[in-house]
Structure formats: C-alpha cells, structure tokens
C-alpha cells in the first residue's frame, strides 16, 4: 500500500480570494510586529505601510488594463504536458505579467527613496533580470513550446548581470563588504571568495524564485512576505533599501490580485527572475546574507527538491536507463499536488511558513 505523504484530509481548501485576504492580513501583522520590535512603538509605521500600499494599489490597478492587452497580444502560457494534468486547463492564460508590476514597483521605490544610489543599483539589477526573463518568455511564445532560450545562454546572462553588480559593489562599497555576518556577532572575512559567493547567490536566488513559480499565487505571495521581512532587516541601516523592499512587497501583493487562483495572468520568467535577483541584490548590498538565507527558505527548499530528484534519479539509474524518484514530481509543490493537496492548500501553508521564516530571519539578523 502506497504511503500518502502530506495527506490533505484534514486541511481546508481556501479560495483564491481567501488567500489574497490572508496574505494582506499577514503582511499587515508583520509590518506591525516589525515596527514594534524595531522601535517599541507603532509610531512611524506609515514609513513602511505607505510604500507597500502605493505600490500594491498602482500594480493592482494597472493589471486591469495590461492583462487584456497581454491576452490581445496572444501571450498565452504553454503548459508542459509532463506536468500535473490539472495544469493543462491553464494553457492560454496570459504570461509575462512581470512586465507591468516589476517596473511599477521599482519606479515607486526610486521616487520614494529620492533616487538613492543603492536603490538605483538594485533597481537596475532587478530590471536586468526582468529583461532576461522577458527574452526567455518571448522565445517560448515565438516557438510555441515550453522551451525558451537555452539554459546555458540564460545562465551566462544571469552571471553577466551578477558580475557587473559585483564590480559596482567593489567600486563603491565599504572595505568591510566582503565580511560575512552571522548570528552571535560572528564575522567571517571572506576576501575574494565573497565575490564568488555573491555571483552564486544572485544566480541561485533568481532561479529559486523561478522554480517556485508553479502554482497560482505561490511565488508572488511568498515573495511579498520575503521582501517585507528583508525590509525590516535592512531598515536600521538603509532607509532606501527598506523602501525598495516595501515597494516590491506591495508590487507582489498587487499582482496576487490577478494571480490568485484561478490566475488571470502569470508573471512568467519576466517576473520570477526579477524578484529573485532583487532579493539577492538587497541581501548582498546590505550585508545581510544570513537573513536572506532564512527568509528565502521556501525558495531554497523548492530548488533542493529539484536537485535531489535529479541526483537520485541519476544515481539509481539501472541497465534499462530508468531510475527511481524521491518525489512524485519535482519541485516540491508538484509533489504535494500529486499527493492530494489542492493548489490553494499549498499556497496557504507556504504563506504561513514564509511568515514564520520572515520573523525568524528578522530575529536572527
């Protein structure tokens, strides 16, 4: 008898609208908690609520105009046939949604921070990764398949952006930028190894959020929470980066309005690569890699599930060329789907887990 891992029998099945409300409440409670922990009062909480709200409203409203345009341009998603069968009905849903909420969120951040040089830098990185994703999405649409630009080309472009950002940090950063700060006031001087780590973090984080973007509202909602957690972490040292993270969090919330189940639009690589690049850029520039690692727990687990699945399959491959699988399907959210969880159950649980990780990342900063 097959063991049912992660049985969903006792879990409710929330609607997409319920999850949007849950996400909004979670973000508000996190903003209140972080403000209290930082200042022991709620005075000044508007400094975070305002950029989150402005960005969310702007992106949410813009979506009502852009989504019909994307549909008219025939940017319908091509769904992989070897994926969950329940996803086949998603074919034709407009993709490349990142093209409207990413630039708006970055623009609001630039204005709100009065074009702080650090915000300009991470904004450029974000838009650069967005363009890499857009090229990939565009190739998918042109070829009418689920394959965009080659993995090698995508990786080279991601590395190129990472290298340029690292060169900028090397040119403008403090002498201590290559130190890795860990909990307990432990500081590890990495020297030149920091730059290798920085490039890896930028590429890995952008791909991790990309892998997570496989269920309606999953990547956008978890990123909204992650950005808010990162905003609280960087607030004591950089108001500009705090505003940037708050705006990206709001942008994701505005996008969830349209991306909640059943999704009216997907962010595509255009959005997911940009979000990961933005998280990594802020974490590196602010010297908060440990906090970034904690709040990105969902993304890394999703990535590790793919790595483990592929590695185990290759390691157990027999004479017939077939191997064994650890999961029913990778990444993890697809395994949960095939184990009986609904999309909304997965998203709701992941939201709550990521909220806990955001708090943990803030406390252990």
Swiss-Prot record:
Keyword terms: Cell cycle, Cell division, Cell inner membrane, Cell membrane, Cell shape, Cell wall biogenesis/degradation, Magnesium, Membrane, Metal-binding, Peptidoglycan synthesis, Transferase, Transmembrane, Transmembrane helix
First-tier enzyme category under EC: transferase
Subcellular location, principal: membrane
Membrane topology of this protein: Multi-pass membrane protein
UniProt-listed Enzyme Commission number(s): 2.7.8.13
GO cellular component, one term: plasma membrane
Database matches in PANTHER family: PHOSPHO-N-ACETYLMURAMOYL-PENTAPEPTIDE-TRANSFERASE, PHOSPHO-N-ACETYLMURAMOYL-PENTAPEPTIDE-TRANSFERASE HOMOLOG
Protein known as: Phospho-N-acetylmuramoyl-pentapeptide-transferase
Organism field: Gloeothece citriformis (strain PCC 7424)
Record gene name: mraY
